[in-house]
UniProtKB/Swiss-Prot annotation:
Gene that this polypeptide is encoded by: SKIP32
GO cellular component, as recorded: cytoplasm; mitochondrion; nucleus; pollen tube
Tissues expressing the protein: Expressed in leaves, flowers and stems, and, to a lower extent, in roots and siliques.
UniProt xrefs under SUPFAM superfamilies: F-box domain
Positions of the UniProt region annotated as Mystery domain 2 (MD2): 163-201
Name the UniProt record assigns to this protein: F-box protein 7
Signal peptide: none
Organism the protein comes from: Arabidopsis thaliana (Mouse-ear cress)
Length: 328
C-alpha cells in the first residue's frame, strides 16, 4: 500500500506536466518529413539488389557517350562553366583528354614533344594544371587598349576655352600559330570584333604580324609591317599577366617603336616580320628617311574581352559616360 501511494502522485505530476506543455507547442506535421530520405524503388521485375537512383532529367537526355562528345568540342573556358552545373559534370570535365587537346592547341608552336617534356617536368603530368599555370595568350577574344586624351577645341561666343575628350583603341587578336592581327581605330569594340579576322578586306586597315611568348619572363615580342611607299615596322613589347590564376587577361604595353625597313628585306621575309627585326636596337632603322621613333602616348594596358562579351563590354561606352578606364 505504501509503494502504490508513492507512485500515484508521480504519475499524476507527469500527466499534468504534459498537459501544460501542449499549450506551448504548436503541432507542425511537416516537421516529421525532415531527415526522411525517400529512395526510389527498383523497376518492376528487376533482379538487381543495388539501390536504384533516379538520375536527373538532363542526365537521362545526355548519356555519358554523348556528353563526352559534347565536352570534347567545347572551348576550355566553356568547360570551366560546365563544371559548375552539377557534380557529375565537374568530374567529367576533369578528363585529361579535354585539357590535353587544349594545351597542344594553345602551345602548338612549341611542338608535341616539347610540350610533353614540360608537362612531366613542371606540372606533374597534369594537363589541367598545365593549362591553369602555364602562361599563354588567349585566342577566344580580343585584347583591347582604350586610350583617351584631351584636345583643345575652337572658341565660340559662349565657351572661351573648349576642350574635347578623344577616345581611340588598339586592338590585338592572337592566333595559336604565332600570328596576330593589329588595328588602331576610334571604332568601338562591338563594331571591330565583327571583322577582326584574316578574311577582312583591305579597307578595314587590319595589319598582320607575328609574335613570340617567352616562358621565362612572360614577355611578348611582336612585329607588324605597315605597307606603302615607305614601309614601316611597328615593334611591340608586352608583358602578360592575369587578375586570377589562368586568366591571362591583361597585357602591359612596355614599348612601341616604329622603324624603317628596306624593300629587299620585306620581299625576303614578308611572312616572318618578327624574324626580320630580331636583335634590333630600339633606335635602329634600316631606312635613313624613316627614323626610329619610340612612342610614349597611348600606352594603356590591354584588357582581354571574350567574343561573347564584346556587345556588353563597358569599353563600348563613349567618353561622355566613361572618360577613363582603369584596367586593374
Amino acid at each position: 500500500m505504501t509503494s502504490d501511494a508513492l507512485t500515484i502522485p508521480s504519475e499524476l505530476e507527469s500527466a499534468l506536466r504534459l498537459r501544460t506543455v501542449q499549450y506551448f507547442i504548436t503541432k507542425r506535421p511537416w516537421l516529421d518529413l525532415y531527415g526522411v530520405h525517400v529512395r526510389p524503388v527498383p523497376p518492376f521485375g528487376s533482379t538487381s539488389r543495388k539501390p536504384h537512383f533516379d538520375p536527373a532529367l538532363i542526365h537521362r537526355c545526355l548519356p555519358d557517350e554523348l556528353l563526352f562528345e559534347v565536352f570534347a568540342r567545347m572551348m576550355p573556358y566553356d568547360l570551366g562553366r560546365a563544371s559548375c552545373v552539377c557534380r557529375k559534370w565537374r568530374y567529367t570535365v576533369r578528363n585529361p583528354m579535354f585539357w590535353r587537346n587544349a594545351c597542344l592547341k594553345a602551345w602548338q608552336t612549341a611542338g608535341v614533344i616539347e610540350n610533353y617534356k614540360i608537362l612531366q617536368s613542371k606540372y606533374d603530368g597534369s594537363w589541367r594544371k598545365m593549362w591553369l599555370l602555364r602562361s599563354r595568350v588567349r585566342t577566344d577574344g580580343l585584347y583591347v587598349s582604350r586610350n583617351t586624351y584631351i584636345r583643345a577645341g575652337i572658341a565660340e561666343w559662349k565657351i572661351t576655352n573648349p576642350v574635347h575628350i578623344v577616345c581611340y583603341y588598339r586592338y590585338i587578336r592572337f592566333y595559336p600559330s604565332g600570328r596576330f592581327l593589329y588595328k588602331n581605330s576610334s571604332q568601338k569594340l562591338k563594331d571591330v570584333a565583327k571583322y577582326m579576322n584574316f578574311k577582312a578586306s583591305k579597307s578595314e586597315n587590319l595589319y598582320k604580324g607575328t609574335y613570340t611568348l617567352s616562358m621565362s619572363d612572360d614577355k611578348i615580342e611582336a612585329a607588324v609591317l605597315y605597307p606603302g611607299t615607305r614601309p614601316t615596322v611597328l615593334r611591340i613589347r608586352l608583358r602578360l599577366r592575369g587578375t586570377a590564376i589562368g586568366a591571362n587577361n591583361r597585357m602591359d604595353l612596355l614599348s612601341l617603336v616604329t622603324s624603317g625597313v628596306n624593300d629587299e628585306e620585306i620581299s625576303s621575309t614578308e611572312e616572318d616580320i618578327l624574324g626580320l627585326v630580331e636583335g634590333w636596337e630600339d633606335d635602329e632603322t634600316h631606312n635613313p628617311d624613316i627614323p626610329a621613333v619610340s612612342h610614349k602616348r597611348g600606352m594603356t594596358a590591354f584588357v582581354f574581352v571574350p567574343f561573347e562579351e564584346v556587345d556588353e563590354s563597358v569599353l563600348n561606352l563613349p567618353p561622355e559616360k566613361m572618360d577613363y578606364y582603369v584596367t586593374g
